[in-house]
């Protein structure tokens, strides 16, 4: 297991109370040895005007996952901040849920890179994101 902080899924989800994460319906669903996953509904909260999943909602899911994964790689007195987010959208989603899967690409002392892949309910890749974070403290 790579994580330096040991939080349960309930504890992870509690961090979202009264935030945009909760408003979008993002819920952490899996914490593995080197992976963090979350689901987000595709509904009126996350649609763009034409009834499809908004690219910004996919980006919000990615940044949520990468930032929390980055935080779990820090020690007491440290935090992470996002420095760059890149998203490539592959296919539209109009309903149901999407699942984000976050894994590390680089874990340095001062910066991290995370890959977050967003899948639809059929397991098809809908969006590929990369988040860079800086470790502070």
Swiss-Prot record:
Entry-linked SUPFAM superfamilies: Thioesterase/thiol ester dehydrase-isomerase
CDD domains attached to this UniProt entry: PaaI_thioesterase
Catalytic site positions: 63 (nucleophile or proton acceptor)
Residue numbers binding substrate: 48, 54-55, 82, 89-92
EC top class named in words: hydrolase
Subcellular location: Cytoplasm
Keywords associated with the record: Cytoplasm, Hydrolase
Record EC number: 3.1.2.-
Outcome when changing residue 68 to V: 47-fold increase in catalytic efficiency toward 1,4-dihydroxy-2-naphthoyl-CoA and 10-fold increase in catalytic efficiency toward lauroyl-CoA. Does not affect catalytic efficiency toward benzoyl-CoA
Outcome when changing residue 63 to A/D/Q: Loss of activity
Any one biological process term the GO annotation gives: enterobactin biosynthetic process
GO molecular function list: 1,4-dihydroxy-2-naphthoyl-CoA thioesterase activity; acyl-CoA hydrolase activity; hydrolase activity, acting on ester bonds; identical protein binding; thiolester hydrolase activity
Pathway per the UniProt entry: Siderophore biosynthesis; enterobactin biosynthesis
Function: Required for optimal enterobactin synthesis. Acts as a proofreading enzyme that prevents EntB misacylation by hydrolyzing the thioester bound existing between EntB and wrongly charged molecules. Displays esterase activity toward a wide range of substrates, including acyl-CoAs and aryl-CoAs.
Similarity remark: Belongs to the thioesterase PaaI family.
Quaternary structure annotation from Swiss-Prot or TrEMBL: Homotetramer. Dimer of dimers. Interacts specifically with the aryl carrier protein (ArCP) domain of EntB.
Protein name: Proofreading thioesterase EntH
Native source species: Escherichia coli (strain K12)
Gene: entH
């Amino acid at each position: 297991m790579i994580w330096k902080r040991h939080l349960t899924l309930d504890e992870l989800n509690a961090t979202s109370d009264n935030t945009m994460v909760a408003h979008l319906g993002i819920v952490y669903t899996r914490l593995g040895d080197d992976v963090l996953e979350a689901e987000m509904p595709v509904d009126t909260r996350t649609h763009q005007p034409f009834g499809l999943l908004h690219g910004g909602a996919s980006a919000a899911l990615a940044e949520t996952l990468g930032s929390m994964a980055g935080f779990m790689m820090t020690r007491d007195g440290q935090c992470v901040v996002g420095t760059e987010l890149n998203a490539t959208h592959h296919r539209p989603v109009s309903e149901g849920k999407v699942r984000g899967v976050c894994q590390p690409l680089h874990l340095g002392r001062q910066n991290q890179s995370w890959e977050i892949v967003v899948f639809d309910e059929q397991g098809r890749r809908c969006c590929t994101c990369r988040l860079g974070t800086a470790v502070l403290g």
